[in-house]
Amino acid sequence: LPYGLTLKHKHIPELRAYAKLSRDPLMQPAVGNFAQGMITVVPLQLGQLEKVPSGAELHAALADHYAGIEGGFVEVAPFGDIERSPEIEPEHLNGTNRMKIYVLANDARAQALLLAVYDNLGKGASGAAVQNMNLMLGLGA
């Protein structure tokens, strides 16, 4: 069920700050009939960028970035047309510390969606805090 329909979700200011955005991002959260697990969807209007990347270029940038990160917690799914996938399901990664990112794109419309599937309780604030501490102290994952 969707909520935050006023488009004033409490996390918008931090999304804007950390992503260094000049405008508020569009965020429309929803909840379902499950105890944990989450899909975050980030819509991108690529045509608003100075240089418009293709979906493949966007995918390659994310895949290259996460391939070099120790620990391998984040996986970027193979790029291609996906109409439906059993893996794009909120509970798919429950009980893990993993995240899977999907890049869905329509190059003709210069639009893309980034989808991230993860266990919001296992990958929640406490897990993120430990990973941030490790980064700050120069420790491994």
Question: Where are the model-predicted features located?
Answer:
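C-terminal substrate-binding/catalytic lobe of Rossmann-fold NAD(P)-dependent oxidoreductases
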Residues: L1-L114
